[in-house]
């Protein structure tokens, strides 16, 4: 029987809760599989709504600053998204009789460099980690990357989901024939175009906290569109929201991945970067996602996504045809599900299988 491992997972909450969302899902999946996780956070406030029932058995949430006083380091140490580990903790890593697996978990991207960079090592020749080697783990969409987070039973849960019952329990009452759309967004000038985009059919827009709820009250709504504010949702309930809706507007990384597992049409708002690197990242994903799509669907999707992300003017933008978009979402999910999930690959990466 293989020994239970101890995992140290470090995350700095930069903004918008995307980093902590990814790390919390990983911590939960590790704990559910019997591993011990110490999650080191510089700001755990978001867990009050992301995980309202508290940390499950196997997860210990600790303040970042306390890592400098930790007595020992775990078997696996993950620094998420390039956060720099405290030097005293790195020294604890170097002091272990058996060096820990030191992993830099990178941001998700479909760009070509990901396949080239996945698995590369960075030997430490100086400093407190001298003698250790850090390795880079890149999530991605191909077999030559680290894959996507997908917990066991996720697709089965989505397939057996009772949307009407869940919506009723949340106080959401769509009218007969009304489309359900969810909205999770960063500040976005294109948001003012959304009511007109949705106006071609009756729509109930479910707005997540933050930018959507600040901006929507100031927008004129067509007679066919109404909106409802949502409270902060736990990760599990956010998944259910995506499953229940016909169309999902998502942002960043965590909700972007979950929208793909929902198997529903979605529109992605990528995290904007000052050097416009996000434009290349967006196009790289669309190139892969739409490679086998119907040409008409591909054209409409590219135009909408680029306009939604402020990369092209909002001129004659329409939603892709719903049936074609749904078929594309299902086909893409099936393709992704044929690849090993991220945790399976991460375990193989550090020399543990199963």
Whereabouts are the PLM-identified features?
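Catalytic donor nucleotide-activated moiety binding site of glycosyltransferases and closely related
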Residues: 200-231
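A short helix->loop->beta-strand "cap" motif at the edges of active sites that frequently abuts
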Residues: 97-101, 203, 264
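A donor-sugar binding/catalytic signature common to diverse glycosyltransferases
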Residues: 24-27, 233-281
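C-terminal amphipathic helix plus adjacent low-complexity
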Residues: 151, 291-354
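A conserved mid-protein helix/loop that constitutes part of the nucleotide-sugar donor-binding site
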Residues: 21, 188-196
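Active-site and donor-binding regions of nucleotide-sugar-utilizing enzymes
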Residues: 9-128, 210
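A nucleotide-sugar donor-handling region in carbohydrate enzymes
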Residues: 107-191
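Nucleotide-sugar donor-binding patch of glycosyltransferase catalytic domains
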Residues: 265-311
